């Protein structure tokens, strides 16, 4: 072997791990990398599994950041929350790119293993449901999907009854002296949020005097970023599904593309979009 072809090993690099934790042990890679179990013999099922598992890992981090941001805003610590919410947006942009990879799966390939999924569907993703709850889109009827696992059902029940990111953002408006209608402040937070004129008026004032309400303005823009990315994710989801299965019914029983098109119209922070027209 020529001198320049030899493997270079720096003297300080650790090679003896008999009594020390390794990279693989820290990340529990044996468990993580043994979780991709195909139910068919089709080569492309591995792609399908990995894409969805990777997305679930990213969603775990999104929930970690969203929940921390909600607690931070509750405690009037908006600056730390901005960093967490900005990170959520970056994660969302990463997840969106995964649709490009899944789109390499053709209809002919997917149909070879689709029956192996049974009634399993991304619609049942409990982490995605918890993200929706954290953002304020509450759907109590969806809890029935998770009754098979009582511990999981209890976690979702707790998430349903917890204040959302928008709930604490509205409370931040109140703390700044804005007058918000009592029906908003005393509403049933287990139900989807409905837009309100007093909330819109408050945000309009924030946007009209950015210097005075800089922190609230920054918070509002972070929320818009998150909803914008989420809508882009939904659109890419819808188009990828249409590309692979057309207008067939989803494995979970939904109408598939038709359902995904309808959810594109769901808004999390309606007043923040409305003020853009009224400024």
UniProtKB/Swiss-Prot annotation:
The keyword Transport does not apply. InterPro entries: Trp/Indoleamine_2_3_dOase-like, Trp_2-3-dOase_bac, Trp_2_3_dOase. It comes from the Bacteria. Binds 1 heme group per subunit. Heme binds at residue 237. Its EC number is 1.13.11.11. Belongs to the tryptophan 2,3-dioxygenase family. Homotetramer. This is Tryptophan 2,3-dioxygenase. It comes from Bacillus thuringiensis subsp. konkukian (strain 97-27).
């Amino acid at each position: 072997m020529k001198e320049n072809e030899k493997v270079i090993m720096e003297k300080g690099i650790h090679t003896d791990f008999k009594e020390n934790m390794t990279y693989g042990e820290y990340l529990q890679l044996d468990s993580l990398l043994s979780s991709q179990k195909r139910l068919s013999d089709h080569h492309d099922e591995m792609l399908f599994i990995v894409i969805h598992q990777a997305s679930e890992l990213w969603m775990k981090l999104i929930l970690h950041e969203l929940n921390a941001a909600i607690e931070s805003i509750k405690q009037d610590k908006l600056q730390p929350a901005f960093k967490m919410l900005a990170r959520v947006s970056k994660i969302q942009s990463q997840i969106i790119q995964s649709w490009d990879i899944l789109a390499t799966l053709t209809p002919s390939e997917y149909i070879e293993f689709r029956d192996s999924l049974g009634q399993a569907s991304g619609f049942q993703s409990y982490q995605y449901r918890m993200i929706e709850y954290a953002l304020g889109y509450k759907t109590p009827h969806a809890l029935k999907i998770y009754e098979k696992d009582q511990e999981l059902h209890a976690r979702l029940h707790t998430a349903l009854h917890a204040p959302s990111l928008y709930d604490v953002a509205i409370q931040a408006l109140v703390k700044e002296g804005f007058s918000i209608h009592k029906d908003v402040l005393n509403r049933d937070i287990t139900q989807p949020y409905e837009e309100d004129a007093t909330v819109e008026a408050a945000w309009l004032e924030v946007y009209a005097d950015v210097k005075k309400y800089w922190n609230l303005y920054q918070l509002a823009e972070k929320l818009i970023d998150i909803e914008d990315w989420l809508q882009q994710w939904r659109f890419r989801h819808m188009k990828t599904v249409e590309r692979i299965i057309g207008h067939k019914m989803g494995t979970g029983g939904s109408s598939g593309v038709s359902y995904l098109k309808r959810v594109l119209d769901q808004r999390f922070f309606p007043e923040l979009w409305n003020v853009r027209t009224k400024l």
